[in-house]
Curated annotation (Swiss-Prot):
<keyword id="KW-1015">Disulfide bond</keyword>
<feature type="binding site">
    <location>
        <position position="200"/>
    </location>
    <ligand>
        <name>FAD</name>
    </ligand>
</feature>
<feature type="disulfide bond" description="Redox-active">
    <location>
        <begin position="100"/>
        <end position="105"/>
    </location>
</feature>
<feature type="binding site">
    <location>
        <position position="231"/>
    </location>
    <ligand>
        <name>FAD</name>
    </ligand>
</feature>
<keyword id="KW-0472">Membrane</keyword>
<feature type="glycosylation site" description="N-linked (GlcNAc...) asparagine">
    <location>
        <position position="458"/>
    </location>
</feature>
<dbReference type="GO" id="GO:0005789">
    <property type="term" value="C:endoplasmic reticulum membrane"/>
</dbReference>
<comment type="similarity">
    <text>Belongs to the EROs family.</text>
</comment>
<feature type="glycosylation site" description="N-linked (GlcNAc...) asparagine">
    <location>
        <position position="35"/>
    </location>
</feature>
<feature type="disulfide bond">
    <location>
        <begin position="143"/>
        <end position="166"/>
    </location>
</feature>
<feature type="active site">
    <location>
        <position position="355"/>
    </location>
</feature>
<feature type="glycosylation site" description="N-linked (GlcNAc...) asparagine">
    <location>
        <position position="468"/>
    </location>
</feature>
<keyword id="KW-0732">Signal</keyword>
<dbReference type="InterPro" id="IPR007266">
    <property type="entry name" value="Ero1"/>
</dbReference>
<dbReference type="GO" id="GO:0071949">
    <property type="term" value="F:FAD binding"/>
</dbReference>
<keyword id="KW-0274">FAD</keyword>
<keyword id="KW-0676">Redox-active center</keyword>
Amino acid sequence: MRLRTAIATLCLTAFTSATSNNSYIATDQTQNAFNDTHFCKVDRNDHVSPSCNVTFNELNAINENIRDDLSALLKSDFFKYFRLDLYKQCSFWDANDGLCLNRACSVDVVEDWDTLPEYWQPEILGSFNNDTMKEADDSDDECKFLDQLCQTSKKPVDIEDTINYCDVNDFNGKNAVLIDLTANPERFTGYGGKQAGQIWSTIYQDNCFTIGETGESLAKDAFYRLVSGFHASIGTHLSKEYLNTKTGKWEPNLDLFMARIGNFPDRVTNMYFNYAVVAKALWKIQPYLPEFSFCDLVNKEIKNKMDNVISQLDTKIFNEDLVFANDLSLTLKDEFRSRFKNVTKIMDCVQCDRCRLWGKIQTTGYATALKILFEINDADEFTKQHIVGKLTKYELIALLQTFGRLSESIESVNMFEKMYGKRLNGSENRLSSFFQNNFFNILKEAGKSIRYTIENINSTKEGKKKTNNSQSHVFDDLKMPKAEIVPRPSNGTVNKWKKAWNTEVNNVLEAFRFIYRSYLDLPRNIWELSLMKVYKFWNKFIGVADYVSEETREPISYKLDIQ
């Protein structure tokens, strides 16, 4: 009987503690538990990587200084437009399944050409592509854009296509359309499921170097970090621009960010690594910018902003010579280039138009950065001028846009860190409530209650005597007659068995009531279960089979011990 009472008290105490929001007060020990979580658990004074002679704090400072000018630069008429074939056939598998039918997946193309500046008009674009030198083949037309745009007198020299890390002819196809990037921002579209998982699985498993290969050279490790940082940067953008279905507004989603990025310090680190790689590529072409300074087609203000951005970068931000220092060979370099070119082609298999657009832009930007860093021979000035001179306008736009995406990712990481801190220290801190009302604290308080109950059961008579004695001391000034103690008759064993019988009867009745209520609730439970199955089947039918599972239903209950 006493044990049953104690167990009942335990259950009641546990339920009360679990459902109360203010059961406990946060202690220093709880605060230490918060500090041990994995959000950006990186020493900001450490270097980003062995090939980067710059710390996380230094990159944050650089990004803060250039952020305004970079944002204005990317919104200018020259850099905010991009040309792309959105419906190029996937060359890896049949990608007709899993189409994203959400309006957020679509892309708004430019139809009113009259609103475009002169250098984006069709006849101007056509002249750039057609007025080429006779000795060059058609595939080199677009590569000579910057030379023609700036009316340089230097004759271009033919160069093999083997230096490209992406297919530069993707932007001149007959099905290519012009897109205003400011009207199609990168944000959460709801695209996901098995098809999206297949994209990243193919990139990591079939194109990244294997675990046995990585660690043997910085080049192979750098390839994986580029892909991982690219993936993490996309996740950060989607977390920042997430549709709140209750308010209808696009706003940051801390829970989604934590589930995808915040709990994984290596992913945050790889984003900073990518930032350093692209920044060094921009710094490396700075001496050649006057040679294709857009010939007065871009106003002076935009030129100044571009100079302000690149001038604050430094050569120490990334040492590309160290990446291939010990194993620079044509075979490894060709393999590196071939694998990354495959990554850019895999973007054609993405069935969300908006996702494909930004995937192609950013992979093209990374490909351009790699070409600048690894194909320009510092000892050969002629080769440097030649490679930079053959950059297409789309490569240059993609390079700046990719740097802008990484800049926004770095800014978003710091923003999410502040949001995370406010949640930990806020009055409505559900994560704090988890640590304060966790199962072990509940058991601790329940154990106290059990001990108290058992002590009361075992010392009822002693408790009464102590109470009477304490009362006599409290009212010592009153002369009260002593109460006459009349012994009550005790039936002994009879009362004991009677109480036990009544208790067991009540338990049986309660069990029958539980079974009865379960049968009453059965139709409703079957209806809800069937509705959920139909809902999942419908999502699978329209191509978003795992859409529900990607949302964090219990966002605060992440596994903070994940490495």
